[in-house]
Amino acid sequence: MESVQTRLCASSNQFAPFKKRQLAVPVGSVNSLTHTITSTTVTSVIPKNYQEKRQKICHIISSLRNTHLNFNKIQSVHKKKLRHLQNLLRKKNEIIAELVRKLESAQKKTTHRNISKPAHWKYFGVVRCDNTIRTIIGNEKFVRRRLAELCTLYNAEYVFCQARADGDKDRQALASLLTAAFGSRVIVYENSRRFEFINPDEIASGKRLIIKHLQDESQSDINAY
């Protein structure tokens, strides 16, 4: 009996449940936790056209940053061009004044032939500046120089220049003529030396009236002498 029991005990010990072996844990790491960090790299695909456009824009920005404008040089160039245009305009007006002088000289030889003007006669000049008509009285040299200056500096328009018997009388006659034709739409300044038109469209009509009056009066003065 004892041998049988001994065998049974031995066989039961062989089929006993297996116990897991506990691993030794260090004293300082009883409550420590182990974390596993997983990094994920996401690669985005950028279209090629976008990259090219971006490079072009960056290149333009860089070029603009490196561009420095010399405004003084630009201003100097514009001043030179403006000065050149002013010189051309001055030469043009001088040529016009010279041609007018030659034309009037030729007219004097044909119209006033064998007629000697009295010594007290002075030259009477008329010029248009925008919406204003100016009159000038003096010797021939002074009047022609003043007309040339106005035409050159103020882009004025030559209207009339001729020797007259009484320039002050002509001024008063022109003031009466323009006032009768245009009324309050024309303003008389400086003892009838200057006539300003309120309506710029009427200055052409006023200029024609002045020329006609002065030409008619010139012929009558010549006939009187």
Swiss-Prot record:
The keyword Lipoprotein applies. The keyword Lipoprotein applies. Keywords: Early protein, Host cytoplasm, Host membrane, Host nucleus, Lipoprotein, Membrane, Palmitate, Virion. Palmitoylated. One of its GO terms (cellular component) is membrane. It holds the Pfam family Viral_env_E26. It is found in: Host nucleus inner membrane; Virion; Host cytoplasm; Host nucleus. Plays a role in the sorting of ODV envelope proteins to the host inner nuclear membrane. May facilitate the fusion and release of nucleocapsids into the cytoplasm. Modulates the expression levels of IE0 and IE1. Interacts with proteins IE0 and IE1. Interacts with protein FP25K. Interacts with host importin alpha-16. This is Protein E26.
